[in-house]
Regions:
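Structural core segment of the AMP-binding/adenylate-forming
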Residues: 12-13, 63, 90-122
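Flexible, non-catalytic linker and terminal segments flanking ANL/adenylate-forming cores
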Residues: 1-12
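Ser/Thr-centric signal marking residues that sit
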Residues: 9, 45, 121
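Conserved AMP-binding/adenylate-forming core of the ANL superfamily
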Residues: 6, 23, 27-78, 82-86, ...
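Residue-level marker of intrinsically disordered, low-complexity segments enriched
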Residues: 8, 37, 51, 94-96, ...
Length: 122
């Protein structure tokens, strides 16, 4: 009996799950969440998530980002946070999550010391 190879990265684990369960839900967006962020409510399947992750990672790569870069994410708890995180991870980019509740001094310190090359803010 053959077993699947153990994924070596978070993105590899995601891709393995997406290949195994493409039509299963990956994320669920509740109506309250959808209303708050102006996005569509419902489920995002692994297949749809994998397609978005691929498209986002291609865009980041074309923009010159790759292994060794750091990108800050300030997107609150939206689906795009997770999709962008997987896209960046695919390229070896480190994610610097930013809590939207940080005070200005905390935010200044985090940005000043994390050596980010870009930030995604929504």
């Amino acid at each position: 009996m053959m077993t699947e190879a153990k994924p070596q990265t978070v993105h590899a684990a995601f891709r393995q799950a997406a290949a195994r369960w493409p039509e299963r839900p990956f994320l669920a967006v509740l109506p309250e969440t959808a209303e708050r962020y102006g996005i569509e409510a419902g489920e995002i399947t692994y297949a749809a998530a994998a397609e978005t992750v691929e498209r986002l990672s291609v865009g980041w790569a074309k923009a010159g980002f790759g292994r060794g870069h750091r990108v800050a994410l300030l997107t609150e708890n939206r689906p795009i946070y997770f999709l962008t995180w997987f896209a960046l991870n695919r390229l070896g980019i480190s994610v610097v999550p930013i809590n939207p509740d940080l005070r200005s001094a905390e935010l200044e310190y985090l940005i000043g010391h994390s050596e980010i090359a870009a930030a995604v803010v929504l």
